[in-house]
A protein has these predicted regions:
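Bacterial N-terminal signal peptides
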Residues: 7-16
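Thiol-based oxidoreductase modules, predominantly thioredoxin-like and allied folds used
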Residues: 65-84
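Structural recognition of the beta-strand scaffold that forms the well-ordered cores
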Residues: 38-41, 69-74, 97-102
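Local sequence-structure signature of Cys/Sec-based thiol-disulfide redox active-site neighborhoods
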Residues: 28-68
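Non-globular targeting/processing and membrane-anchoring segments
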Residues: 19-29, 124-151
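Bacterial Sec-dependent N-terminal signal peptides
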Residues: 2, 15-38
Length: 151
């Protein structure tokens, strides 16, 4: 029994002292953060009006110095992903192209709260969201070398 205790003590001692501590380099936390806005566009290759939605989304992104991020959620075509229809259902998408701006709820003409909105509203609500204060931030340090990326 004493030998087992000695073996356990030696094993735990080796494991404990052989670990190398990794020192994380975390810079100072900034006093303020840059507000970013996410626009998620419901679209499809089959949709005749969707190129206009893509054009409006691109204009909104370009007009806001990289503070608006656009994502196209395809439905009913070869670029669709499994969760697009789920998101459309949860956020009450009623047409194409339409989209969500930071997934905020806004009132429609009848006073109903909707998250998915017409492409004509994206710019207005993106500017409104950009005017709000960002209470937290996210920093990602990345490096790309050839075909490898480190995050």
């Amino acid at each position: 029994m004493k030998e087992y205790i000695k073996i356990l003590i030696i094993t735990f001692g080796c494991l404990f002292f052989s670990c190398e501590e990794e020192v994380l380099s975390i810079g100072p936390v900034p006093d303020s953060f840059t507000k970013k806005v996410l626009i998620e566009e419901f679209t499809g290759a089959w949709c005749g009006y969707c190129p206009d939605g893509a054009h409006r989304l691109e204009n909104t992104i370009n007009a806001n110095n990289g503070n608006v991020i656009g994502v196209s959620l395809h439905s009913g075509d070869q670029m669709s992903v499994e969760h697009t229809d789920y998101l459309g259902s949860v956020y009450q998408n009623t047409g194409f192209p339409s989209g969500m701006v930071d997934r905020i709820a806004v009132s429609d003409f009848y006073g109903n709260l909707m998250v998915s909105m017409s492409r004509g509203s994206w710019d207005y609500f993106a500017l409104d969201q950009l005017g709000k204060v960002a209470n937290c931030g996210l920093a990602i340090k990345s490096e790309v070398s050839g075909s490898k990326a480190n995050v």
